[in-house]
Amino acid sequence: MPKMKTKSSAKKRFKVTATGKVMAGQAGKRHGMIKRHKKFIRDARGTTTLSAPDAKIVKGFMPYDR
């Protein structure tokens, strides 16, 4: 049976931690930040953990990052 391939788009966007959580960057920061509140901009920094259903989908894209 051939090796399973990792989705290149997923490996660039997500990181699986040692405990199995999937980390991703916050969405909604590409443009239009002038009308956002300062609190939104602060909270949108860094990464966030994905919910369980979303994490299951992303882990399917990356078979060797478990």
Swiss-Prot record:
For this UniProt record, the keywords arranged alphabetically read as follows: Ribonucleoprotein, Ribosomal protein
Q: One of this protein's Pfam families, by short name?
A: Ribosomal_L35p
Could you mention a single GO BP entry for this protein? translation
Q: Which GO terms describe its molecular function?
A: structural constituent of ribosome
For this protein, the record's PROSITE patterns field holds:
RIBOSOMAL_L35
Q: State the family it belongs to.
A: Belongs to the bacterial ribosomal protein bL35 family.
What is the name of this protein?
Answer: Large ribosomal subunit protein bL35
Task: Give the species this sequence originates from.
Answer: Ruegeria sp. (strain TM1040)
